[in-house]
UniProtKB/Swiss-Prot annotation:
Its cofactor is Zn(2+). InterPro entries: ADH_Fe/GldA, ADH_Fe_CS, Glycerol_DH. Its EC number is 1.1.1.6. Induction: Repressed by glucose. It is an enzyme of class 1 (oxidoreductase). Binds 1 zinc ion per subunit. One of its GO terms (molecular function) is zinc ion binding. Pfam families: Fe-ADH. This is Glycerol dehydrogenase 1. Its main location: mitochondrion.
Length: 450
């Protein structure tokens, strides 16, 4: 039997490793400095539109900073044991936020565990968009005696739970129901307009208190979600190394720590070793060790890696693609980030052999590596320049790189990825093409046979 994975930490302090049989644990030294730094409003958000700098306090910091959730728990049927972990922060009342689909699938398992132990639980239904209008509506539905906010679901639900918790000065517990991104662990939320356009980032002084993952739920999700998470996580090491080389400020607000860098590298190594097996496990709905390892890589390692390392071109390219219309928006976050990672590799002038190795691994993971697979085979030069200009907005993470670019260079790199990838496909006889799904939320990806 695969035991639960546990990780306990206090944010922004030096790493101390602890061994524990059948579990993975790390602890961070505590200090009164957190209270002194942030004052009484421990959970007050810092709202900013700058993704690569965390508030004014951090811009000039050259200290090594490592930030993380207080605890990470991952295991099969973990939601049925919710009270065991929630009671550290709340024993009387909780708000559980999930969309209707997640309520139908698994969120009630958490409610049942809490209710059976005497807690009063308020169930809120997330409307689907992490906009200020929706967040204000949800905030008003939270009882005054709420002790903890629990977000169950995808990225926007998790971001909403973080925002509400911090606005109420309450601890937050984040329960991803897919391993499709590394958003769960971070101390930020992405805020959108009511019609789904990016509006701003909200940064918080502390990460979520608990990341709580039931892998029996994760493994029942369509394999496309796991693959998207792999695409997102593959960017972590590439972007972190770029940020370190340029000595830029990490999302944590200072210089990347050795721990952050090694976690990003461990994320890459774990994916290279286990991703293909995990994808096959997911197609059969079985929680193998490989599957558990990739869930941890997609969620914990990638989350700690990007926040303590930083973002660079890969995510900026993803954001830049919002400048054009069309089928590309049927792709999930990690699917677009994967292509953005290849663009960054071209911008950094990696050897063609290294590009081919990365592109081939992505293709084997059923990620898009050509413009046709992105759904934009006939994209025009002007549209690519629009992507380039959006990628280079002043607040974008591409400015964490040591080299500076112009829109034409971005457009050329996007086309170069398409050219190199097509050439690799021709030379190797690779015929398994990524098939653009009918919608962003469609579970269908391609025919993946175990």
């Amino acid at each position: 039997m695969i035991g639960p994975r546990l990780c306990a930490a206090t944010p922004r302090f030096p790493l101390v490793s602890l061994a524990h049989r059948n579990s993975k644990v790390f602890a961070l030294a505590s200090s009164n400095a957190v209270a002194q730094r942030w004052g009484k409003r421990f959970y007050a958000p810092i709202e900013t539109e700058t993704p690569h700098k965390v508030g004014v306090e951090f811009e000039e910091s050259k200290d090594r900073i490592f930030t993380s959730p207080q605890k990470y728990v991952q295991g099969r049927h973990a939601f049925t044991r919710s009270y065991m972990y929630v009671k550290k922060w709340a024993t009387k009342s909780a708000v559980v936020l999930a969309d209707q689909n997640v309520w139908n699938i698994c969120a009630n398992k958490i409610v049942d565990s809490l209710s059976q132990n005497g807690m009063t639980v308020t169930k809120l239904v997330f409307g689907g968009e992490a906009s200020l209008v929706e967040l204000d509506k949800l905030r008003k539905q939270c009882p005054d005696d709420t002790q903890v906010i629990i977000g169950v679901g995808g990225g926007k639900t998790m971001d909403s739970a973080k925002y509400i918790a911090h606005s109420m000065n309450l601890p937050s517990i984040i329960c991803p129901t897919t391993a499709s991104s590394d958003a769960a662990t971070s101390s930020l939320s992405v805020i959108y307009t009511p019609d789904g356009q990016f509006q701003k980032y909200s940064f918080y002084p502390l990460n979520p208190n608990l990341i709580f993952i039931d892998t029996d739920v994760i493994v029942r999700a369509p394999v496309r979600f796991l693959i998207s998470g792999i695409g997102d996580a593959l960017s972590t090491w590439v972007e972190t190394e770029s940020v370190i080389r340029s000595n830029s400020t990490s999302f944590a607000g200072g210089v990347a720590s050795i721990a952050g860098r090694y976690i990003a590298r461990a994320c890459k190594d774990t994916l290279e070793k286990y991703a293909l097996s995990a994808i096959l496990s997911n197609t059969r709905g079985v929680c193998t060790e490989a599957f558990e390892n990739v869930v941890e890589a997609n969620t914990l390692m990638s989350g700690l890696g990007f926040e303590n390392g930083g973002l660079a071109a890969a995510h900026a390219i993803h954001n830049g693609m919002t400048a054009i219309h069309g089928p590309v928006h049927r792709l999930m976050h990690g699917e677009k980030v994967a292509y953005g990672t290849l663009v960054q590799v071209v911008l950094e002038d990696w050897p063609l052999e290294d590009f081919n190795n990365l592109a081939s691994f992505m293709a084997k993971c059923h990620l898009p590596i050509t413009l046709e697979e992105l759904g934009i085979p006939n994209v025009t030069d002007e549209e690519l320049l629009m992507v380039g200009r959006a990628t280079l907005r002043p607040d974008e993470s591409i400015h964490n790189m040591s080299k500076k670019f112009n829109p034409s260079q971005i457009a050329d790199a996007i086309k170069a990825v398409d050219s190199y990838s097509q050439k690799w496909q021709e030379q190797t006889g690779w015929t398994e093409r990524f098939r653009l799904p009918p919608s962003r939320h469609s579970p269908h990806l391609t025919d993946i046979h175990p």
